[in-house]
Amino acid sequence: MEMVVQGVSTRNIKKVTEELCGESFSKSAVSEICKELDVPVKHFKERLLPEHYPFIIVDAIYLKAREDHRVKSKALFVAIGINNTGHKEVLGFEVYDSEKVNTWRDFFENLKSRGLRGVDIVISDAHAGLVEAIKESFSGSSWQRCQAHFTRNIIDKCPKKYSTGLASELRDMFNAATIEEARRLKESIYDEYQDVANEAMTVLDEGFEDSITIMALPSKYRIALRT
């Protein structure tokens, strides 16, 4: 069962059990054993969410899955809730064909139907469909652009010879003690790099304010919510 949880294929499970146990398990037998996971997974995904989670982090991870005798790319949506004490909990996950407004909306509405409420800040990357669904499903909440994704977006547009220095200065900017200090450092970075990394500075300028939403919170929350 542990091999299944770790993502080992049924074919490889068969090989491992033969080598370790000296006994052969067919792929169908392994598949039947795997079905034992269906009930606890279903229970986990459908459980109620009575606790208050003012902050949620959402993201999609792309995985390969076999469907209709073909290997396809699938998007695994994940939501992590953070309560007032800083405790993190996986609120839900679901597999979709792709990231679109309607798939993210469906995912969020499922969380809300299970009791998710009072969300103050949603942290995510800047995928257009995701951001639009956040606005629709969590109206009145603030959006924090994931600082790790944002940094990569900036560095991807920066000439390689400047990327290390820029990445270091961006870290200092995000580690600033106050919003005012972060804004001062942002302007300094912009002035320093606009001539040599103009596209990167455009990304920084356009997305900066959304990336410092959490700066309005007490410092004890910021590290957990930045990405």
Protein language model annotation of sequence segments:
Residues M1-G7:
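Short, amphipathic alpha-helical "recognition" segments used to contact nucleic acids or chromatin
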Residues E23-K27, E32-I123, A128, E132, ...:
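RNase H-like nuclease fold core
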Residues I121-A128, A133-E169:
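Conserved beta-strand -> loop -> alpha-helix junction used to position metal-binding or nucleic-acid-contacting
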Residues N175-T227:
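Acidic/histidine-rich catalytic cores and adjacent linkers
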Residues R11-G22:
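DNA-recognition alpha helix
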Residues K100, C146, T178-E181:
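Alpha-helix N-cap recognition
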